Amino acid sequence: MTVRVRIAPSPTGNLHIGTARTAVFNWLFARHHGGTFILRIEDTDLERSRPEYTENIMTGLRWLGLNWDEGPFFQSQRLDLYQKAVKQLLDQGLAYRCYTTSEELEALREAQKAKGEAPRYDNRHRHLTPEQEAEFKAQGRSFVIRFKIDDEREIVWNDLVRGKMSWRGSDLGGDMVIARASENDTGQPLYNFVVVIDDIDMQISHVIRGEDHIANTAKQILLYEAFGAKIPEFAHTPLILNMEGRKLSKRDGVTSISDFQQMGFTSEGLVNYMTLLGWSPPDSTQEIFTLEAAAKEFTFERVNKAGAKFDWAKLDWLNSQYIHNTPVDQLTDLLIPYWEAAGYSFAGGRDRPWLEQLVGLLSASLTRLTDAVDMSKLFFSETVELSEEGSKQLQQEGSKAVLEAIIAALEAQTQLTENAAQDIIKQVVKAQNVKKGLVMRSLRVALTGDVHGPDLIQSWLLLNQIGLDKPRLSQAIAASL
């Protein structure tokens, strides 16, 4: 079998983590089988669909490394195909125009609710005569088009994740609306209908989507049969849940891929984490995967049925692993946009080699790329604010004399090196007859404003290169008076 799968997002919002995870599973399955991964934009909701959302979806997929083989195809450009399919069902007597008003539908639901029955359409307009249709039209009623569903029919399929699935026609809520009212006789085709037409036309072999589509699958199988088409294989993947076991939503914070990017997650770290959201690798100890490596191992036998809990701590850990293993030059490229967004200036000697030295200093401490903004602030600011602990340190006996001695020693240096910096510290310890700890703490506070921070010598070298070490030492001396 030639594997052909699709990801079919609706451009009514930014690329969602759930849609992206579905895209990951489709991509992995396609690559595992040497198949085709198709992008289809389901923009039949003309009122809510926006081109900026389409762009966000496509940009997000590319950023994650989920490049598609065919598409993008836009449903809004395929309406003729859908309307012909609606007409075919009408001509074959498999669908009909329903003129039931919204008020009548509401009254029906209330009556069913009063009896303790599940809401469903009672198919009252399934057998209208031409005269009855004409009368409804004369009354100014609009219509929807419904596909006939046999209440006695049992719909069975073997789900690649969940095994045997079985639904009765009577569980599907009555005859299915496949097109809403419009100016033409075939109406405006709806989502549940057009996806089937597209999947038939694009020869989709496997439909891989979230478990919240299971009820749709039962209805859509009947549509495949109505058109005499081959029914694809179905795989319904687990939903993404929050740590309390509820479906992940905006109330849980970030849910769109572009938001994750802004928060400082790498594409590799995020897509690695999404791969493990519901799928277990054969080697349970292996957690770090490239997409290509995961594709070699990916099967639906190892996709879980239970919901996948979104664990921020696990995502942070995975992300940090990718950051720590990214070469300095590449990591610098990743960090520059975050520094620019923070308004940091690269003037005053902060050239590319200097930036790469800064990245080398900070990289091991980064969990997210955004961490570099706060950690590097002291290197992009002309002055630093003293922390409470830093102020106390400068009031320690001997701190002022130590800092004055360091400035004096710097006057003899044309270019500070690591060895020269170490020698200055040794000289000051000996000349001032103080412990090395006092010198190191005083110097750190003078340069960084705090008693804690990145490697002191490397920080000093970076600040020296852009001429900020002496001014900060002088500032600290003034603060120690």
Swiss-Prot record:
<dbReference type="InterPro" id="IPR014729">
    <property type="entry name" value="Rossmann-like_a/b/a_fold"/>
</dbReference>
<dbReference type="InterPro" id="IPR020061">
    <property type="entry name" value="Glu_tRNA_lig_a-bdl"/>
</dbReference>
<keyword id="KW-0648">Protein biosynthesis</keyword>
<dbReference type="GO" id="GO:0000049">
    <property type="term" value="F:tRNA binding"/>
</dbReference>
<keyword id="KW-0067">ATP-binding</keyword>
<comment type="similarity">
    <text>Belongs to the class-I aminoacyl-tRNA synthetase family. Glutamate--tRNA ligase type 1 subfamily.</text>
</comment>
<keyword id="KW-0030">Aminoacyl-tRNA synthetase</keyword>
<feature type="short sequence motif" description="'KMSKS' region">
    <location>
        <begin position="247"/>
        <end position="251"/>
    </location>
</feature>
<dbReference type="GO" id="GO:0005829">
    <property type="term" value="C:cytosol"/>
</dbReference>
<dbReference type="InterPro" id="IPR001412">
    <property type="entry name" value="aa-tRNA-synth_I_CS"/>
</dbReference>
<dbReference type="GO" id="GO:0004818">
    <property type="term" value="F:glutamate-tRNA ligase activity"/>
</dbReference>
<dbReference type="InterPro" id="IPR000924">
    <property type="entry name" value="Glu/Gln-tRNA-synth"/>
</dbReference>
<dbReference type="InterPro" id="IPR004527">
    <property type="entry name" value="Glu-tRNA-ligase_bac/mito"/>
</dbReference>
<feature type="binding site">
    <location>
        <position position="250"/>
    </location>
    <ligand>
        <name>ATP</name>
    </ligand>
</feature>
<dbReference type="Pfam" id="PF00749">
    <property type="entry name" value="tRNA-synt_1c"/>
</dbReference>
<comment type="function">
    <text>Catalyzes the attachment of glutamate to tRNA(Glu) in a two-step reaction: glutamate is first activated by ATP to form Glu-AMP and then transferred to the acceptor end of tRNA(Glu).</text>
</comment>
<dbReference type="InterPro" id="IPR049940">
    <property type="entry name" value="GluQ/Sye"/>
</dbReference>
<dbReference type="InterPro" id="IPR045462">
    <property type="entry name" value="aa-tRNA-synth_I_cd-bd"/>
</dbReference>
<dbReference type="Pfam" id="PF19269">
    <property type="entry name" value="Anticodon_2"/>
</dbReference>
<dbReference type="GO" id="GO:0006424">
    <property type="term" value="P:glutamyl-tRNA aminoacylation"/>
</dbReference>
<protein>
    <recommendedName>
        <fullName>Glutamate--tRNA ligase</fullName>
        <ecNumber>6.1.1.17</ecNumber>
    </recommendedName>
</protein>
<dbReference type="InterPro" id="IPR008925">
    <property type="entry name" value="aa_tRNA-synth_I_cd-bd_sf"/>
</dbReference>
<dbReference type="InterPro" id="IPR020752">
    <property type="entry name" value="Glu-tRNA-synth_I_codon-bd_sub1"/>
</dbReference>
<dbReference type="InterPro" id="IPR033910">
    <property type="entry name" value="GluRS_core"/>
</dbReference>
<dbReference type="GO" id="GO:0008270">
    <property type="term" value="F:zinc ion binding"/>
</dbReference>
<dbReference type="InterPro" id="IPR020058">
    <property type="entry name" value="Glu/Gln-tRNA-synth_Ib_cat-dom"/>
</dbReference>
<keyword id="KW-0436">Ligase</keyword>
<keyword id="KW-0547">Nucleotide-binding</keyword>
<keyword id="KW-0963">Cytoplasm</keyword>
<dbReference type="GO" id="GO:0005524">
    <property type="term" value="F:ATP binding"/>
</dbReference>
<dbReference type="InterPro" id="IPR020751">
    <property type="entry name" value="aa-tRNA-synth_I_codon-bd_sub2"/>
</dbReference>
<comment type="subunit">
    <text>Monomer.</text>
</comment>
<feature type="short sequence motif" description="'HIGH' region">
    <location>
        <begin position="9"/>
        <end position="19"/>
    </location>
</feature>
